[in-house]
A protein has these predicted regions:
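Short, intrinsically disordered N-terminal pre-domain segments
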Residues: 1-17, 112-117
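Solvent-exposed serine/threonine-rich low-complexity stretches and specific carbohydrate-binding patches
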Residues: 11-16, 64-74
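Surface-exposed ligand/attachment interfaces on beta-rich extracellular proteins
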Residues: 15-30, 44-50, 74-81, 99-103
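Noncatalytic modules at the cell exterior or secretory-pathway interfaces
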Residues: 34-38, 85-107
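A structural motif
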Residues: 69, 110-113
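Aromatic/hydrophobic beta-strand junction motif of beta-rich domains
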Residues: 40-42
């Protein structure tokens, strides 16, 4: 039986990123949760955009969550869903925008699944 689902917004609708670079969300504490079930959407981009669902024990060293898709890109004007297993205390989403004159509009939201006792 799955644990209770708690809504989470990692990047608000409609976040616009301008210029090549790495954009990270604020880390959220997820020690009471076992999975992150996230949906991402992006509009057409100038350049390339990839999302990374990452976790950390100390908010300094980050690693890709188990089960997360590396270089996750749902595609232009498309929504994609991914589930990541949570094993560490902190969760964030990192967006990497690349290319000359790069810009993108996107969002990432979903649910955190509570651990069962």
């Amino acid at each position: 039986m799955a644990g209770a689902l708690v809504p989470v917004v990692m990047m608000r609708r409609f976040t616009t990123l301008v210029g090549p670079g790495t954009y990270s969300t604020v880390a959220i504490e997820v020690k009471d949760h076992q999975n992150a079930i996230l949906s991402a959407w992006r509009g057409p981009t100038s350049g390339t955009l990839a999302f990374y669902v990452e976790e950390s024990i100390d908010q300094k060293t980050w690693s890709l969550c188990s089960g997360a898709v590396p270089d996750w890109d749902p595609g232009a004007a498309a929504e994609g869903t991914a589930t990541a297993s949570l094993r560490k205390r902190w969760l964030r989403v990192r967006a990497v925008l690349a290319g000359a004159g790069a810009r993108a509009t996107c969002w990432v939201l979903g649910f955190l699944e509570r651990r069962e006792s």
